[in-house]
Amino acid sequence: MPIFVNTVYCKNILALSMTKKFKTIIDAIGGNIIVNSTILKKLSPYFRTHLRQKYTKNKDPVTWVCLDLDIHSLTSIVIYSYTGKVYIDSHNVVNLLRASILTSVEFIIYTCINFILRDFRKEYCVECYMMGIEYGLSNLLCHTKNFIAKHFLELEDDIIDNFDYLSMKLILESDELNVPDEDYVVDFVIKWYIKRRNKLGNLLLLIKNVIRSNYLSPRGINNVKWILDCTKIFHCDKQPRKSYKYPFIEYPMNMDQIIDIFHMCTSTHVGEVVYLIGGWMNNEIHNNAIAVNYISNNWIPIPPMNSPRLYASGIPANNKLYVVGGLPNPTSVERWFHGDAAWVNMPSLLKPRCNPAVASINNVIYVMGGHSETDTTTEYLLPNHDQWQFGPSTYYPHYKSCALVFGRRLFLVGRNAEFYCESSNTWTLIDDPIYPRDNPELIIVDNKLLLIGGFYRESYIDTIEVYNHHTYSWNIWDGK
């Protein structure tokens, strides 16, 4: 156990030991100890006050005192008062710090703080942080605040159980707060409010003071509006937190510049938010992802995927964002949504697939094509299931087709076209597009199914086609 010596105090111990000795028995938490009260009174004002003898005609040579200190910490302080030496290790340092603060023994206070800062442990950071606030220990407070902010996800339960409004605010307003996105902070504040049953006023103040609303998803914004009971959210112009700040994005940067960075990425959308996932950056496949709100014209952070991806496909389902296949791991699947701590790996596909067509009906995810130019297999994943299953095969191979659900049917269109009906579990052929296409897109405009883009035989297709559900055929769209 490390020993720390107060050399200045040691020089005075001999003189103190020559003074008249008065024995005092101190009842502490967990035991009692007999001390020389004369020496202990010289140590700090606390002991002068608490060990003072009451005046009586016949003084008892031994007095009894009760102190609200644990016996182990008190013993260490008593030994220090006799010898000028204090024994500190990671097991006793926190309790000894608290006891020395209560007893005003400054040498032990600063020795304990220096020991904690030099050999910092996660297991006592929360308690030290709260002592830093309670007793105004600025260096301890600053160090523990930064540590908790950086290890926020690991310490979340301890924070909820122990922190009041002020303790919480200092952490959540930090640029160093390590969170995957800003929605996570909103969800955390709500959990803290429910668990601790705090006053609603504290919840409102926290939301207004710590949330960086310009990086919230629509889901996060709706949660804030619900809490604040308002239709418009407050404006915040703070910089993004370091944990979700993109190193390749300069601030500020417009949406077009961000989209250009995500070259050859996978894209999908939920409402007004478009998700850009993976692709090719700096001559390599990467695992970055970002969301762009084209209504509010701001970007929303997304944590990096578990795997880099190129030629993958994305689909929203089960209130999550799924990314399927692609290089370099064409059978891998993972999912995430705003407020989640990280992407979660999902069951692998039965076949490797690149740029497969994906769609979701009733939260069942369907994957078609992307395996080979002759493959007609399909796969599906039921909600809360841990394995993909083969579905009914398509009539044609759909190596570079696209899929979209329209009118309760799953349309699969590329060089050929067909649709899937979930109730009958069958595929039905429809007329092929007028212009066969690789990698086109299906969109819905004014309740019409439109086929746009794509290329064929190294030429891009600029003609838009509209589906006629009466004739099961395609027509050139005139914009009406």
From Swiss-Prot:
<feature type="repeat" description="Kelch 3">
    <location>
        <begin position="365"/>
        <end position="408"/>
    </location>
</feature>
<feature type="repeat" description="Kelch 5">
    <location>
        <begin position="448"/>
        <end position="480"/>
    </location>
</feature>
<feature type="repeat" description="Kelch 1">
    <location>
        <begin position="273"/>
        <end position="319"/>
    </location>
</feature>
<feature type="repeat" description="Kelch 4">
    <location>
        <begin position="410"/>
        <end position="447"/>
    </location>
</feature>
<feature type="domain" description="BACK">
    <location>
        <begin position="125"/>
        <end position="223"/>
    </location>
</feature>
<feature type="domain" description="BTB">
    <location>
        <begin position="10"/>
        <end position="90"/>
    </location>
</feature>
<protein>
    <recommendedName>
        <fullName>Immune evasion protein OPG047</fullName>
    </recommendedName>
</protein>
<dbReference type="InterPro" id="IPR006652">
    <property type="entry name" value="Kelch_1"/>
</dbReference>
<dbReference type="Pfam" id="PF00651">
    <property type="entry name" value="BTB"/>
</dbReference>
<keyword id="KW-0880">Kelch repeat</keyword>
<dbReference type="InterPro" id="IPR015915">
    <property type="entry name" value="Kelch-typ_b-propeller"/>
</dbReference>
<comment type="function">
    <text>Might have a role in the suppression of host immune response.</text>
</comment>
<keyword id="KW-0244">Early protein</keyword>
<feature type="repeat" description="Kelch 2">
    <location>
        <begin position="320"/>
        <end position="363"/>
    </location>
</feature>
<dbReference type="InterPro" id="IPR011705">
    <property type="entry name" value="BACK"/>
</dbReference>
<dbReference type="InterPro" id="IPR000210">
    <property type="entry name" value="BTB/POZ_dom"/>
</dbReference>
<comment type="similarity">
    <text>Belongs to the orthopoxvirus OPG047 family.</text>
</comment>
<dbReference type="Pfam" id="PF01344">
    <property type="entry name" value="Kelch_1"/>
</dbReference>
<keyword id="KW-0677">Repeat</keyword>
<dbReference type="InterPro" id="IPR011333">
    <property type="entry name" value="SKP1/BTB/POZ_sf"/>
</dbReference>
<dbReference type="Pfam" id="PF07707">
    <property type="entry name" value="BACK"/>
</dbReference>
